[in-house]
Amino acid sequence: MNRTAIFIGLFLLTLSGYGQNASHQRTVAEERVHVTPSSATVLQWFQWIEKKKHITLSYNSSQIDLSRTCRIKREQDMSVSELLEKILEGYQFRTTLLSDDKLLIQIIRQEIYCLSGTVTESGSGERLYGAAVTLENQSAEIKYTLSDENGIFRLLVPEGHYKMKISYMGYQPYERSLYIRRDSKVFPQMSPLLFELEEVTVKSHKQGDELDALTPASLLSFSGNDLFSQIWILPGVTGTPSGDNFQVNGGSNDENLLLLDGVPVYHPGHLNTLFPVFNGDAVKSMVLHKGYFPARFEGRLSSITEIKLKEGNKQEHVQTVSLDMPAASVVLEGPIIKQKLSYLIGVRRSWLDLFDELLSEENRMNHSSADYNAKLTYAITPSQTLEAFAYGAKDEYHVPTEEKERLSLLRWNNESYQLRYSGFKGRLGYAASVYYTSYSNRVHAAALGYDEDRYIQSGINSTNVSTEFNYSSDAMYNARWGVKYSYDRYELTNDDNEASVRLEPISQFSLFYDNHLRINDNLTVQVGVNFIGYIPRKSRSYYSIQPRFLLQYSPSKKDMLYLCFSKMEQFYHYLRFGSVALPTDFRMPSIDGYKPRSADHYEAGWKHYFDNGQLELSAYYKTRRNIIALHPDAFYSDAEWKTFIMTGSGYSYSARLYFQKYWKHWMVQFSYTYARSMERFNEFRDRGDLPSLFDIPHQWTGAVAYKLNTRSSFSLGGLVNSGKIIDMNDWEAIEASDFRKLRRPLNYRIDVGYTYKRDFGNRLLLFRCGLYNVVGNPTEEELLNFYSVSWGNGCLPYGGISFRF
């Protein structure tokens, strides 16, 4: 009996002790603290609680983002548990008392949900590439991303209330509130701002993780030369105002690749260099990659430009008619099935040559340019899209004959066709495409000195199939991977006694994998690799591993430091022997011992952002291998290319400054580039490093625009460049002793422009006019080609009008 009583007593005493501990635990968690309005990191709040209540908080730091900022908006008294819930909003946790002064915080695994969707333009249904999407929770934490080339975005966040904001140049900001408790889809639509772009508005800006993005967008038009005319204001980019034959980072013209809806256009230029590369009225966006290349890109050393065509208005039928100095164009778009199936058709043609019969022979144009775009877009579901597009361009130089007929001396042709499917489901996005693209260059034998009535032709055609995926596993990690296969068929012509032609079939496949890791809110890393197999049927095969690396660190909200590395290889060589491209030019894939060109690009930079502007300082170093050049002593009417082609290596480096600032009525952009591009060849070993043909040590560019009112604006732009190296003297090859020694004088140019914009309800009007080279000393290339219609001293008037209804 006594034993039973003792046992019961001990049991009650144990319960009493447990109750006291539980009571003490509740007391610690429920003790009141006085909190004033303030903002601090999670770690600072933990330290403040420990100091105020003289306790120790125990937790696993790998499970909590201690650098996250938590803000208390008003002064109040609250319990420790209530304060912890504020500090750890979005986390599921429980507290346990370990001792009288030690409280354990245990994090229960946090559920992460995927918010995905497609950003489109209201009314037309156009998907928007590069829209900045942000989610802000109640603690003012922000998650952000950019919509991809299909307008698709994904954000991974825990359950909670969020404010969603979307911004895109030329569109009204979008905002809505969301409560996310499961994987969800949204399809925000953005309203365009009429005529938001000014005459000179090229932005090299960073939104989120994007580096060196050029994404113009306009409700009306990129009429005339808008698409490329101001690209030269970016540091490291030089070229003619029409966008033809531009150079990037000291590289040659053929080191740049243009992708039209993902399809390569092998020769985008036109005989009439006033004629812009593509029809701006049909273009939706443009992105220029130079320096860092995402792993999905390959094939060129200097730059890759993505140009996206519009999809066609899904709500109503719209027509855009444009007439400017080089061409007239018509773009038709509209729904076939509203909200589901849309069309886009664009046609352009030069018109100055139509008046040749009224002019004397020496003043005739004798050449014409024309192109077309056609596209069908079918929204199978809000998250699945099927697209088909076609593009064609023809340039022809002709002369009248005695029979008053036109003899075609030279003709360039481009053709591209593509079928593409894309979509997303939750955290997984996917796309597949098949395309065919071709380029041909045909010249009459008489133009090359042959006494024959026939044509000589060269070209390339390519068939490609590809598929790719991207996946977001959580808020910190994103992966993108894919595979491509292409079958290329080169038609090569030698300028020998018979202008012989040979066919070279080549297979190529590539695999890429890209990882994007956000280590914290200030530090992101992108690491990828592209593996390529290049397999000619008649020559040696090559296999290439191309790593890519990008590190971005933001020490503050207004500053970003970046470091990047890209290895690129190019399986194509091209040397043009005259002022225009001919089929007898040196075009050579990586066969017959001509190894692929390769480059390693290292770059570091700093960007500072301020209200409506930015300042950027950057520097790069780039190595090149297996480059080619024409020997000055060569007589190149020979079937043996190796008798006049030299191979060597090179390097380039640069320090660059870029500034832009916008005010209510003013806009200023300025860039300065100091750069050197050097090459070395065994044939000139005793000369050491020689400047390349694209070595431009100093380059200044600037633009100023003033907005008179909501409809009118003036602009002034200019450039000053060091002269290029001379490789031809009066159309004759220079002596070997002067090889790469002579340089042209300083080039400079000042342009002025005026823009008038007005909307009449559903009708929109844009008028542009101005003068290129009001004062200046333009390059010989510009005088011979671009300024074919000019006033005195190479001053070129331009004008254009667009009407949308």
Where are these regions (language model features)?
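Periplasmic N-terminal accessory/gating domains of Gram-negative outer-membrane beta-barrel systems
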Residues: 88, 146, 172, 187, ...
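Short, acidic Ser/Thr/Gly-rich low-complexity loop/linker segments typical of extracellular
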Residues: 138-152
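Outer membrane beta-barrel strand-and-loop segments of large Gram-negative receptors
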Residues: 456-468, 502-512, 595, 601, ...
